[in-house]
């Protein structure tokens, strides 16, 4: 399974759990926000945003020279 499929399964599971336990939507958002997956997604998003901001501010970096071919 790819990451998108797992994310959809996670959200559907959280919706079902939240619906069974309570009818308040705020508690569901708290659970999602505090979950490990959400923390990983936020940190990945922050890193991508920082990289993008650095590229915009500093201009595109020159690409490193291609590595020499490996001998077999």
From Swiss-Prot:
Superkingdom of the source species: Eukaryota
Residues annotated as signal peptide: 1-22
Keyword list, A-Z: Antibiotic, Antimicrobial, Cleavage on pair of basic residues, Fungicide, Hypotensive agent, Metalloenzyme inhibitor, Metalloprotease inhibitor, Protease inhibitor, Secreted, Signal, Toxin
Principal location: secreted
One of the GO biological process terms: killing of cells of another organism
Other notes: Shows a very weak hemolytic activity (6 uM causes only 3.5 % of hemolysis).
Similarity field: Belongs to the non-disulfide-bridged peptide (NDBP) superfamily. Long chain multifunctional peptide (group 2) family.
Name the record gives this protein: Bradykinin-potentiating peptide BmKbpp
Species, as recorded: Olivierus martensii (Manchurian scorpion)
């Amino acid at each position: 399974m790819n990451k998108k499929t797992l994310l959809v399964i996670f959200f559907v599971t959280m919706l079902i759990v939240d619906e069974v336990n309570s009818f308040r939507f705020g508690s569901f958002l708290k659970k999602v926000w505090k979950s490990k997956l959400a923390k990983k997604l936020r940190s990945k998003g922050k890193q991508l945003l920082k990289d993008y901001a650095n590229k915009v501010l500093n201009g595109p970096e020159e690409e490193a020279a291609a590595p020499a071919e490996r001998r077999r």
